[in-house]
Amino acid sequence: LGYDAKSGDFLWKFNVIPQPGEYGHETWENDSWQYTGDISSWAPISADQELGQVFIPTNGVTIDYYGGHHPGDNLYGTSLISLDARTGERAWHFQMVHHDIWNFDTPTAPILLDTEAGPIVAQATKQGYVYVFNRETGEPIWPIEEVAMPASTVPGEQLSATQPIPTKPAAFEYTGSSEELLVDFTPELKRQALQAVAEFQMGPLFNPPMRANDPSGKQAALMCPSGAVNITHPPVADPESGVMYIMSRYSCSSRRLVSGEEADTYYDEPTGVTLSRFAAASGGPSPRHPAGLPLWKPPYSRITAIDLNTGEHLWMKPAGYTPDRVKNLPELSGIEIGNTGSGAVGQMVATGNMLIYSNVSSDGTP
């Protein structure tokens, strides 16, 4: 919604779920636009005063982890939208997740910079990628490719066959889950990690949730990085150098679906009746390393510096210090593991020659 800042008068409304006749309406199949919602912008909005454009990052569609009731790509869910601030007209948009069921809400404000690549807007995402566009035209600064992704085995779910992945910058965090990412400080710790994940479905970044009692025998699908926690604090950038700094952490969640009616029974006081055929089960199995280690290789949290003039990574450093609970494990006695990072994320400030950040020490204090 747009209002006159001086008078408070209402100026315009932009429908984030396109109505009949509006651009993107066809991405809501089976008339699902009529009863689906929750597309909003919980991250801050950015603006270019000279262009008169506002840049709005959006979240996904109701509900997380199952989308059989809203087939289609579902514009403008999990997108970056550029609107004319005076009229509310769409200048351009880019959808970063088609038919988002992974809780990959766009979590931070878009960053505006003038670089050697031109006037850009850079959007960091939970997926571990930064999407970079010319902020006037919406053209990607570097190619973004539609990459094939696995289909869902859950009845009624129709995932997009592809998802848009930037060719540059490279991912700033691990994406997906695989044996190669499991902790391997010693062969025995790696063996234990493999055993811990044996009953879970590993896979790429857009690994689909699976239903309980799946015919594969797996307990749940691993979603890595988890859509809830990996990047919730805003990146910062130095406008002089064009360098962006992102603090992130890698963690996974396990997702299994049950029937909508069964999902309601997990809550003592449900707010209503679930109409979805499937919904995420509350609680449920999650893999744990028997030694008390994180299952995945460090760094547990990191800061990545990306040159947005070139799209290249400049450096990566662990954020914080190795937790005492990791350093003091008997299984690691006499083994040099280096600084793993704390596993916590915090705030950052960039100056002309310094990057200042908050995190926690090895004993968990700020």
Predicted regions and their residues:
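Beta-sheet-rich non-transmembrane sensory/scaffold domains
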Residues: 1-366
